[in-house]
Every structure is written in C-alpha cells, then in structure tokens.
C-alpha cells in the first residue's frame, strides 16, 4: 500500500492540485461511515455525506470540519488549520488537518471524521 505524506507545518495546499488517487484513498478509509462522496472544487475536493460537507482535500492533505465542540481535540492532536491567501492576508477556515497517523488506518481516522461530520451538521443548522 502506498504511504501518503502526513500534513506538514508549511501549507502544502497552496497552489497544489489534489490527486484523484489520494481522493480515492480517503474515500476508501471513510467507506464505513456510509455513502460518502467527493466533489471537485477549487483544485481539490469537498467530502460530503448526505449533502453535508465535512471534509476537504487540498493537495494531498485531508482537512476535517471543526467547531468549538472539537477544535481543542484537533489542536491537541497537533493538527493545523486549512488556510488560503485572501486579498489582504491569509484566511483560516474551520477545517483542520487529519491528525498524524490516521491516514493509513480507517479505525484511527473514523472517530475524527465522525466528529467533523457532527460539527458540519451543527454548522448547517445555524
């Protein structure tokens, strides 16, 4: 099985198209959650379940939705925010990288993905 790079402290999503191979790898890890699908957007992919976007792929990095209910968990796991260059300054989105060591094992990734889906559903209600 191919080993994918873990998120780095630099921002690898800047000016980097996402690979369909990595997208397929992510979808296979998330398959136990149910009907998860990917939609191309801005050179990467949005990851959806029941029309709720709970993750995104930028470059070859998976970012998961965060809110006040799970942000500290992601920070404590060493995850970093998804950022992009805005017109005047970098903009931080409410998505954090999947914690190190989760991208090769669905059992390790799924609790984080389920937390992200719950955060996305809470955000959609508001």
Predicted regions mapped to residue ranges:
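Charge-dense, helix-prone N-terminal extensions
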Residues: 1-126
């Amino acid at each position: 099985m191919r080993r994918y790079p873990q998120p780095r402290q630099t921002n690898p999503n800047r000016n980097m198209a996402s690979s369909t191979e990595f997208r397929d790898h992510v979808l296979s890890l998330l398959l136990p959650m149910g009907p998860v699908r990917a939609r191309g957007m801005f050179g990467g992919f949005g990851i959806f379940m029941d029309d709720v976007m709970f993750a995104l792929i930028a470059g070859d990095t998976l970012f998961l939705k965060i809110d006040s209910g799970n942000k500290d968990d992601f920070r404590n796991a060493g995850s970093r925010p998804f950022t992009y260059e805005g017109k005047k300054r970098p903009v931080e989105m409410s998505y954090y990288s999947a914690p190190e060591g989760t991208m090769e094992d669905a059992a390790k990734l799924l609790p984080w993905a389920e937390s992200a889906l719950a955060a996305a559903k809470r955000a959609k209600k508001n």
